[in-house]
A protein has these predicted regions:
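Formylglycine-dependent sulfatase
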Residues: 1-95
């Protein structure tokens, strides 16, 4: 039986990608994230589907573009009902 690899997705709000001590930030100390990065994958050039956090998280969790998921903010009256969610896809893959 194939063993699934461990996946840890950290989603932060209002987080600068350079605010990490392992990314040589002069003041910020992030020892736990440093430890994770040493044994994992760090995407130094990752890009977001949209520039604001709510539609970007919706795109990440549903696999749909902002145009397709319709999410703009919390008060946009768009239902949070989509065909697929990342958690569901992980579950379907044995996680």
């Amino acid at each position: 039986m194939k063993q699934n690899v461990n996946v840890l997705l950290i989603v932060c709000d209002q987080f600068r990608g350079d605010a990490l001590s392992f990314a040589n930030h002069p003041d910020v100390k992030t020892p736990y994230l440093d430890s994770l990065a040493a044994d994992g994958v760090f995407f130094s050039h990752a890009y977001s589907a949209t520039p604001s956090c709510i539609p970007a998280r919706a795109a990440l969790m549903t696999g749909r573009s902002q145009k397709r998921h319709g999410r703009v903010g919390y008060l946009d009256e768009v239902e949070w009902r989509y065909q697929h969610y990342m958690a569901e896809e992980f579950s379907n893959s044995g996680y």
